[in-house]
Amino acid sequence: MDATYEELERNDIKGPQEAELLTHAYAGFWVRFWAFLLDWLVIWGLNHLLVSPLFTVLDLPKTSGMFTFSAYSVTTLIVYLAYFALMTKYFRQTLGKMVFGLKVVSVKQDSKLTWSTVIFREVVGRYIDKIWILYIVVAFSPTKQGIHDYIADTTVVHEKLYRK
């Protein structure tokens, strides 16, 4: 840089400028919806590749006569809940979120996802979201959080998309 002392004085440089703090962009309703549909397909595949053949080989009934819950439906529910809980705890994202470049983060700064947070978010949150209209909250929330996100202090963000 070629400048004279007088030119530098006239520019009135006060010191290094602060870098703008960039944060991850929140994931909206539709991208989360498509990620969930992809996860649902993965779980459907797991159940049809592992659980269904196991029940067939062991000659166990997949339905029960009088009761709402059969051993098969309970097993598929366990696969469903375990998939979301384990993937979120260990990878902060499910396969659907990986494909769409999303991840689950804690709202608290530099806070890791604890087992209690993940269990609540993914297990209890799945029951809250059974009332589909409650999931619409994601579309209208400024931080794009669902009811389960608000209660668990989490949110879903884009991995490689930032906002100022």
UniProtKB/Swiss-Prot annotation:
Domain RDD: 26-158
Pfam families: RDD
Membrane topology: Multi-pass membrane protein
Chief location bin: membrane
Subcellular location: Cell membrane
UniProt KW keywords: Cell membrane, Membrane, Transmembrane, Transmembrane helix
Record's GO cellular component terms: plasma membrane
Record InterPro entries: Pra-immunoreactive, RDD
Transmembrane parts of this sequence: 35-55, 66-86
Protein name as it appears in the record: Uncharacterized membrane protein YteJ
Native source organism of the sequence: Bacillus subtilis (strain 168)
